[in-house]
Curated annotation (Swiss-Prot):
Principal EC category: translocase
Protein name: Ion-translocating oxidoreductase complex subunit D
GO biological process terms, semicolon-separated: electron transport chain; transmembrane transport
Keyword Transmembrane applies: yes
FMN phosphoryl threonine PTM sites in chain numbering: 187
Transmembrane intervals: 20-40, 42-62, 69-91, 123-143, 215-235, 242-262, 267-287, 301-321, 322-342
NCBIfam families: PRK00816.1, rnfD
Bilayer topology term: Multi-pass membrane protein
InterPro entries: NqrB/RnfD, RnfD_bac
Function: Part of a membrane-bound complex that couples electron transfer with translocation of ions across the membrane. Required to maintain the reduced state of SoxR.
Quaternary assembly: The complex is composed of six subunits: RsxA, RsxB, RsxC, RsxD, RsxE and RsxG.
Subcellular location: Cell inner membrane
Length: 352
């Protein structure tokens, strides 16, 4: 009688990487639709630019490394990296910025480390942070949602803005950022932080048009809820586990609630933190990256909680209005340590 000895792992998941990546791309559709609805065609154009750049950059590096281009491109990881970066930057950012950021994400943050599965940091967030540090003005120049915008560019004007910086009538970014109150608009988090520094009270800030009739900023709450819908879809499909998004959101909400309770005149409310900025995008689509996140269940809870604390600290006391990207990268640094101390005991062995 012949006995076959198989090596671990003894349980297998039949889902391939390409299928998981495709599920994430599908889950991103509600968020993309919401951002396009509130901020215009620029979101779609940036996604197309980022996707093309990601595929070309990946193909070039794979060819230089003498690896199969077709098989690697078919895992959709490059497309997902480009998409996550594209939806994180302002919709009318110059074309060369998304090309530069995506190229850096693919070539430096991913392929330089050996490709998919080898990178210690989330490539899309590396690209985003490089752009934010290098071009802070352009990276914080978000359009006001169409509901409070004085001027809304059409599809052709959006293309002109991205590639030339001007509309057909000669308008520029400064003009397009003006709201119905005649004041240049920013994101709810940016407006909150800037206004506090200018000496305005929270009560005064909440009267601004960007917060009018909204829990966390006109348009932005619906964008976050749309990303939440996509996240629930990923949980339903078991493409991601619940530990990271739940621990992240609960920790962020708890920190925000405690801060708001003790200092309501200087700190943002929990709903502003949860439904503004890149909160839901980060919780379900960025932090859950299986390559750069913790691999144990306890580790995932710690990883998500750490990111939640960091986001709140950066938003409340840091120099940037939204801290999701920095929090993700800082949490990525701790993953080896978290995994070391949370790895499960080998069956049949006692702790030494």
């Amino acid at each position: 009688m012949v006995f076959r000895i198989a090596s671990s792992p003894y349980t297998h998941n039949q889902r391939q990487t390409s299928r998981i990546m495709l599920l994430v791309l599908i889950a991103a559709l509600p968020g993309i639709a919401a951002q396009t609805w509130f901020f215009g065609w620029g979101t779609l154009f940036q996604i197309v630019l980022a996707a093309i750049t990601a595929l070309v950059a990946e193909a070039i590096v794979l060819r230089l490394r003498k690896q199969s281009v077709a098989s690697h491109l078919q895992d959709y990881s490059a497309l997902l990296t480009g998409l996550l970066l594209a939806v994180s930057i302002p919709p009318l950012a110059p074309w060369w910025m998304v090309v530069l950021g995506t190229g850096f994400a693919i070539i430096i943050a991913k392929q330089l480390y050996g490709g998919l599965g080898q990178n210690p940091f989330n490539p899309a967030m590396i690209g985003y942070v490089v752009l934010l540090i290098s071009f802070p003005v352009q990276m914080t120049s978000w359009l006001p949602p169409y509901e409070i915008a004085a001027t809304t560019p059409d599809m052709l004007d959006t293309l002109r803005m991205i590639f030339t910086g001007h509309t057909a009538s000669g308008g520029d970014m400064t003009l397009l950022r003006i709201g119905i109150d005649g004041i240049s608009q920013a994101t709810p988090l940016d407006t909150f932080k800037t206004s506090l520094r200018a000496g305005h009270s929270v009560e005064q800030i909440m009267q601004y048009p960007i917060y009018s009739g909204a829990l966390a900023g006109v348009g932005w709450q619906w964008v976050n809820l749309a990303w939440l819908v996509g996240g629930v879809f990923l949980l339903w499909q078991k493409a991601i586990r619940w530990h990271i998004p739940v621990s992240f959101l609960l920790t962020l909400a708890l920190c925000a609630a405690l801060g708001w309770l003790f200092s309501p005149a200087t700190l943002a409310s929990p709903q502003l933190h949860l439904l503004s900025g890149a909160t839901m995008l980060g919780a379900f689509f960025i932090l859950t990256d299986p390559v750069t996140a913790s691999t144990t269940n306890r580790g995932r809870l710690i990883f998500g909680a750490l990111a939640g604390v960091l986001v709140w600290l950066i938003r409340s006391f840091g120099g940037y209005p939204d801290g999701v990207a920095f929090a993700v990268l800082l949490a990525n640094i701790t993953v080896p340590l978290i995994d070391y101390y949370t790895r499960p005991r080998v069956y049949g062995h006692r702790k030494g």
